[in-house]
Design a protein with these regions (language model features):
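Outer-membrane beta-barrel proteins
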Residues: 2-4, 38-42, 53-55, 93-101, ...
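A short alpha-helix capping/helix-coil boundary motif
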Residues: 28-32, 88-91, 157-160
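Short, intrinsically disordered/low-complexity patches at protein termini
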Residues: 49-52, 64, 86-89, 146-148
């Protein structure tokens, strides 16, 4: 599946699904990518993702493993166009540093198990883990060196206390856990 759009926007998808094989197993997957130059100056984007799952479907139980991930690299265009540019330059972007980007990826892992104990009762257990990592990079003009843990620079009798900098802030995060449910149906009441 391919789609083309304004501002050199391109979306590509490839997906597959086996359906139930041998009355017990199924595999599904998808790859996606979106790229665009963006409407605003230097507001490009490059987005990639995938999804994979494998499942076992028994008579009284289901076991399914899922993994999906995405990565994005986008040029910054957070601020709107100033009023004085609306008539003459509607695509104006105040960010002019060539690598003013947000670059981040995140991957999710999940394992799901469901067991039908009897006609009225089933148990569900799921585990999940997510890892994310990335940064944003930006130009910062006239920054105090001390704010970055840097010492002043002495050149002859002159002391330099501020400078233009390229700043990159990183994020590296992990999250995981488990969920559990027991469902029981009675004549006039459902318990979870």
């Amino acid at each position: 599946n391919n789609t083309f759009g304004s501002y050199n926007t391109l979306k590509n998808n490839v997906e597959f699904g086996t359906g139930l094989m041998g009355e017990k197993f199924a595999f599904d997957g998808r790859l996606s990518q979106i790229t665009s130059d963006g409407y605003m100056d230097r507001a490009s984007s490059d987005l990639k993702s995938f999804y994979l799952s494998v499942g076992y479907f028994g008579k009284t139980e289901i076991l399914k493993a899922v993994m999906f991930s995405g990565h994005e690299c986008t040029y910054q265009a957070w601020y709107g166009v100033p009023l004085n540019y609306l008539e003459s330059n509607r695509t104006y972007n105040p960010y002019d540093y060539e690598n003013e980007v947000d670059n981040y990826g995140q991957t999710h892992y999940q394992l799901h198990y469901s067991k039908k104990a009897n006609e009225n009762t089933n148990v569900n257990i799921s585990g999940h883990y997510t890892h994310g990592e990335g940064y944003y990079e930006q130009f910062k003009g006239g920054e105090d060196l001390a704010d970055y843990g840097l010492e002043n620079i002495l050149i002859g009798n002159d002391t330099i206390t501020e400078s233009n900098l390229i700043r990159r802030k990183w994020l590296n995060n992990d999250f995981g856990g488990f969920t559990f449910s027991l469902n029981h149906k009675m004549e006039k009441l459902n318990l979870t």
